[in-house]
């Protein structure tokens, strides 16, 4: 029994009005009662949630902070669906975590989502945070946004302390993943899921006119340059996004960027969402928290 058959239904007709928003809404009800502080932050075109696990000091610009970009194929999920993961990350990193509820497909393009992520970063800068105090992190599609945001910030002369990616989708082109050996065993994604994602991304980009032209499809792995933040990636050994994780690490290393990939055998895509119930998820997030602490001093 896997999630793959459920996702396959939506992938056959991705443009139908599926109630993707209900996933995050339902997750809000299911979040356990805890002493974690969750503060809503208004951004120009979206919102964010500033999360502090018990014992973590307020986000006052004096210590480290994490910008977290959730996964969900640019289509679904949010701060609620990722609430347990983010709370654990806040605990292990000893840092507030700003989770961006960026605009989603199909009504909004990936470029618009990226702008929301940039706005969240700027919100922290206006609160007094310096780049070397800020870590960019994301899972799945959020990994794409985190790397792309790091590249945009690099062009603006900003270098965050580190980049952390969990099971990242880093290449929008579908063919390399569909040809990967894990495509037949991935418990989450079949080949049709990548067909559907490509269709949704292209359709939304075509409707977003930038400087008189449709938004271009951006491939971050084609724009790896020296000077990007040090990078840690955690990925399952059985998922098809292992392809993207390894390709990114290879290209980052070739550009002189410190890049580490930790492969978790026997796990599924984004298994860290099962924290704290699954021991491996908790161990992974603890390691990520240690990495963030070390990167920010």
Q: How would you describe each model-predicted region?
A:
Residues 1-56, 207-212, 297:
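A glycine/proline-hinged amphipathic helix-loop "lid/cap" segment
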């Amino acid at each position: 029994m896997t999630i793959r058959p459920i996702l396959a239904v939506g992938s056959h007709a991705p443009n139908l009005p599926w109630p993707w928003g209900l996933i995050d809404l339902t997750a809000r009800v299911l979040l356990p009662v805890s002493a974690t502080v969750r503060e809503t932050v208004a951004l120009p075109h979206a919102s964010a949630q500033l999360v502090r696990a018990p014992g973590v000091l307020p986000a006052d610009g004096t210590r480290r902070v994490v910008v977290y970009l959730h996964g969900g194929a640019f289509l679904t999920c949010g701060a609620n669906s990722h609430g347990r993961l983010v709370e654990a990350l806040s605990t292990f990193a000893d840092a507030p975590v700003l989770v961006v509820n960026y605009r989603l497909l199909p009504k909004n393009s990936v470029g618009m989502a990226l702008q929301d992520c940039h706005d969240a970063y700027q919100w922290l800068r206006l609160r007094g945070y310096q780049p070397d105090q800020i870590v960019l992190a994301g899972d799945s599609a959020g990994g794409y946004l985190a790397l792309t945001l790091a590249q945009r910030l690099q062009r603006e002369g900003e270098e965050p302390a580190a980049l952390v990616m969990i099971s990242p989708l880093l290449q929008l082109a579908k063919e390399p993943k569909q040809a990967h050996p894990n495509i037949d065993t991935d418990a989450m994604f079949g080949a049709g899921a990548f067909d559907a994602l490509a269709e949704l991304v292209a359709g939304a980009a075509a409707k977003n006119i930038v400087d008189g032209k449709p938004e271009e499809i951006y491939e971050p792995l084609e724009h790896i340059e020296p000077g990007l933040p040090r990078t840690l990636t955690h990925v399952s050994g059985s998922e098809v996004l292992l392809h993207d994780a390894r390709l990114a690490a290879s290209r980052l290393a070739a550009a002189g960027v410190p890049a580490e990939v930790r492969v978790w055998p026997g796990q599924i895509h984004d298994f860290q969402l099962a924290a704290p119930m699954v021991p491996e998820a908790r161990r992974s997030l603890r390691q990520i928290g240690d990495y963030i602490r070390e990167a920010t001093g």
